[in-house]
Amino acid sequence: MCGSKSEINPVQAGEGMQAEKSSENRIAYYHLPGLFEFYDLYKAFLPVFRGHREYFYEWCEIGSIYGAQADCLWGGGRVGFGEEPAKHVAALMREYGISARLTFSNSLLREEHLSDRKCNRLCALFEKSGATGNDSMLNTHGVVENGIILTSDLLMDYIKSKYPGFYFVSSTTKVLTDFGQLEDELKREDFRYVVPDFRLNKAFDRLFALPDVWKDKVEFLCNECCSFDCKQRRKCYENVSRKSLGEDREDHVCPSAQAGSGYRFSDAMKNPGFIGNDDIRNIYLPNGFSQFKIEGRSLGSAVVLEFLLYYMTRPEYQLRVREEIYLDSSLDLF
């Protein structure tokens, strides 16, 4: 069951709280949505990001880009719609030395689903497609590792045995709203990163008390628009998992009063769990946290571009970056 505000009791930022450490020289790593879904956007954005680094904040980097192709049996979280050929996606990530994460967060997988040919082909390709570089995702051989975001232990055990070159991320679709659940997940050596439910984002009293080795594993979901008091988040994710398995299901009907308006970044910023740039620089980085996930796989590329501008781009260069992207005539932003 999803937690409520009273259950989580988050400490509000700025209420007598002092940063324990300086954020100087600390880097925020963003994990961006739409590996397949927004291939065209990243094909236009990444040359600007690498070629004009002065346009962007010096304290941030791209940690990974995550997503799934359309009709992936192992998919979950959001219904994937990415149609770009996997070899093109792998080549783009390799060119820019960025970790690719396959979103395989279906929570309802059974043994018979593990032989799915499409998902196995993706694993075979991306396990071997890492680039060389100096990113935080390097393995001991100087190669940028690719990852798997998952919920199912059954799937994790299968991938570990058949495709041992991946690292694993514990998906936010587990809906870890109890802090004890988060601590138990952080203890698991299988996971390099753990994405807690966004309602733990401001549980600063408990978060700051974590050992440094666990802080390094926490990956915060920054821009969730779901109601803070939602009690049906798990059911919503299970609905997506069933659809990915090919079950004929009606869409989950969100009971939130704001559900009819769809995702709006301006509304997400009002969410009690929202993490903005000031929070990252003044609260999270100084206290030892460096991993931040941006949601948006099911949105339009124009909205995702706004995330890239807000979280990564200096205000005085946002118009210039926007123009660079818009002038790419091959990109359909809507």
Where are these regions (language model features)?
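Intrinsically disordered, low-complexity polyampholyte segments enriched for Lys and acidic residues
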Residues: 5-9, 15
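Active-site pocket-lining/capping segments in soluble small-molecule metabolic enzymes
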Residues: 14-181, 185, 191-334
